[in-house]
Swiss-Prot record:
Protein name, UniProt field: Small ribosomal subunit protein uS14A
One GO term (biological process): translation
Keywords: Ribonucleoprotein, Ribosomal protein, RNA-binding, rRNA-binding
HAMAP family: Ribosomal_uS14_1
Cellular compartments per GO CC: cytoplasm; small ribosomal subunit
rRNA-binding among keywords: yes
Pfam families xrefs: Ribosomal_S14
Family statement: Belongs to the universal ribosomal protein uS14 family.
Taxonomy, superkingdom: Bacteria
InterPro entries in the record: Ribosomal_uS14, Ribosomal_uS14_bac/plastid, Ribosomal_uS14_CS, Ribosomal_uS14_sf
Function of the protein: Binds 16S rRNA, required for the assembly of 30S particles and may also be responsible for determining the conformation of the 16S rRNA at the A site.
Length: 89
């Protein structure tokens, strides 16, 4: 489990990205880069890092499922992920 402060910071960054998304889009399209620079740094989606939604773990993130490989494995073995089954060939 990630530190609570890191998870809280990530949630705050996500909220800022959503809040400024439309404004950023219009400023970029109009080429008003001076105003774009004045926006908060964390409002840029480039600064976001994918984190597991269940544990907050930043490494081993699986985009398709939105969770870390460790949590994915646990849930898959328990049969809690629909459509996922153990491979055998």
């Amino acid at each position: 489990m990630a530190k609570k402060s890191k998870v809280a910071k990530h949630e705050h960054q996500q909220a800022l990205v959503e809040q400024y998304a439309e404004l950023r889009r219009t400023l970029k399209a109009e080429g008003r880069f001076d105003e774009l620079r004045k926006l908060p740094r964390d409002s840029s989606p480039t600064r976001l890092h994918n984190r597991c939604e269940l544990t907050g773990r930043p490494h081993g993130y699986m985009r398709k499922f939105g969770m870390s490989r460790i949590r994915f494995r646990e849930l898959a073995h328990q049969g809690q992920l629909p459509g996922v089954k153990k491979a055998s060939w």
